UniProtKB/Swiss-Prot annotation:
Catalyses which reaction(s): an NDP-alpha-D-glucose + (2R)-3-phosphoglycerate = (2R)-2-O-(alpha-D-glucopyranosyl)-3-phospho-glycerate + a ribonucleoside 5'-diphosphate + H(+); (2R)-3-phosphoglycerate + UDP-alpha-D-glucose = (2R)-2-O-(alpha-D-glucopyranosyl)-3-phospho-glycerate + UDP + H(+); ADP-alpha-D-glucose + (2R)-3-phosphoglycerate = (2R)-2-O-(alpha-D-glucopyranosyl)-3-phospho-glycerate + ADP + H(+); GDP-D-glucose + (2R)-3-phosphoglycerate = (2R)-2-O-(alpha-D-glucopyranosyl)-3-phospho-glycerate + GDP + H(+)
Enzyme Commission number: 2.4.1.266
Descriptive protein name: Glucosyl-3-phosphoglycerate synthase
Bilayer-spanning residue ranges: none
Taxonomic lineage from the root: Bacteria, Bacillati, Actinomycetota, Actinomycetes, Mycobacteriales
Gene assigned in the entry: gpgS
Organism this protein belongs to: Mycolicibacterium smegmatis (strain ATCC 700084 / mc(2)155)
Length: 303
């Protein structure tokens, strides 16, 4: 199945033009969501690459703010996006922290039949990111989730490894999928933040908390629709702010908890304890993990 899927559900050199995809919309509407938390340095340039699509391929461009304390909102608005706070997106539900929460709330703040998610910390993103993500959804029957894949450069101490990024993906997510959901081995970037889905799908599945959201959506889609409901598209190169290993370890803990949950395996629910050098001593710090999904949005906002 994996080999066939790579042939007919994976695009390495997609040839769609924006005009082709506009014609393929056939009355469907498209929303683009940028989740953001203190991304003043990059959010404006990401918005600027998508704004030219407004009024044509894209009907709605929203930055969903997760409580930024910098100039994220100011710069996003100046670049041409509508900014919605996590509180305003779903005022009847008190917000929780984390990326999964913001993406879940974005379903209530948008109206598109198709929703594309793009991370707001990207550096020099290709203006074709969104069109490529939309391609399979607009041109192929039965596809409900499209994942982007790409080369991921990593900068460390001034040096760059052209393919060294995606450390949590390569060290945690893909090995675990090989063990627990081997059918998803063919998905190159299971944790990638650039993806698109139909509202029909996204509002019918739970959203995992924090950085578990991407792996949760992927496994839930596979369990509901099989590989034929998923596609992937080559977006070229994706560069963003590289995070320190301490942050990636906390992220990994949430990814593991979510994947175990989706596979019916009990997780301890115990947070990750990390030890930080302090002179000759080591100071423990604990980062929490959450096992509490948000319910399908259709249970709160039936369409």
């Amino acid at each position: 199945m994996g080999h066939r899927w790579l042939t007919d559900h994976s695009w390495n050199r997609p040839s769609w033009t924006v005009a082709d995809l506009e014609a393929a919309k056939a009355g469907r509407t498209v929303s683009v969501v940028l989740p953001a938390l203190n991304e003043e340095e990059t959010v404006g340039s990401v918005v600027e690459t998508i704004k030219p699509l407004l009024g044509g391929l894209v009907d709605e461009l929203i930055v969903l703010d997760s409580g930024s304390t910098d100039e994220t909102e100011i710069r996003a608005v100046a670049a041409g996006a509508k900014v919605v706070s996590r509180e305003a997106a779903l005022p009847e539900v008190p917000p929780q922290p984390g990326k999964g929460e913001v993406l879940w709330r974005s379903l209530a703040a948008t109206t598109g039949d198709i929703i594309a998610f793009v991370d707001s910390d990207l550096i020099d993103p290709d203006p074709m990111f969104v069109p490529k993500l939309l391609g399979p959804l607009l041109t192929c029957d039965g596809v409900h989730l499209v994942k982007g894949f790409y080369r991921r450069p990593l900068k460390v101490s001034g040096a760059e490894d052209a393919n060294g990024g995606g450390r949590v993906t390569e060290l945690v997510a893909r090995p675990l999928l090989a063990s627990l959901r081997p059918e998803l081995n063919c998905v190159l970037q299971p944790l990638g933040g650039e993806y698109a889905g139909t509202r029909e799908l996204l509002t019918s599945v739970p959203f995992a908390p924090g950085y578990g959201v991407e792996i949760g959506l992927l496994v839930d889609t596979y369990d509901r629709l099989g590989l034929d409901g998923i596609a992937q598209v080559n977006l070229g190169v994706r560069a963003h702010r590289n995070r320190p290993l301490t942050e990636l370890a906390s992220m990994s803990r949430q990814v593991i908890a979510t994947l175990l949950s989706r596979c019916g395996i009990s997780d301890s629910g115990v947070g990750l304890t990390q030890f930080f050098a302090d002179g000759d001593d080591f100071t423990p710090r604990v980062s929490s993990v959450s096992l509490a999904d948000r319910p399908p949005m259709t249970t709160l906002r039936p369409r």
